[in-house]
């Protein structure tokens, strides 16, 4: 069963962290249409958070068309990711795993890896903007 994790130091509200994790799990194929999400009660107890936080996340997922509640049964994934995405992501994941091994060998911790990716992504976006303008 799918399990959530929270990062208290991320600065991202807990309900958004839950929403982002479901989106990512769906894109990566860890969750599929019809899969049941953990109950509000279970998530709240597991993460030691207010159940209303979980309800807010699940409502956001419902609003986005990603999940839907079934009375008396729970909340289920209702959306599917693009069929081509998992295949495309397999190649990207293989490249990423190779890169992460190199980062690990270089002694980078999770925070340094995240920062490096964020900076590289930002620089690439700026570069792409410049190319579009020219």
Predicted features, each with a name:
Residues 52:
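Key DNA-contact positions within bacterial/archaeal DNA-binding proteins
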Residues 104-134:
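C-terminal regulatory/oligomerization modules of transcriptional regulators
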Residues 15, 39, 73-90:
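Short, cationic-aromatic polyanion-contact patches
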Residues 1-10, 126-134:
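N-terminal intrinsically disordered/low-complexity leader segments
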Residues 30-35, 62-72, 76-79:
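Beta-hairpin "wing" of winged helix-turn-helix
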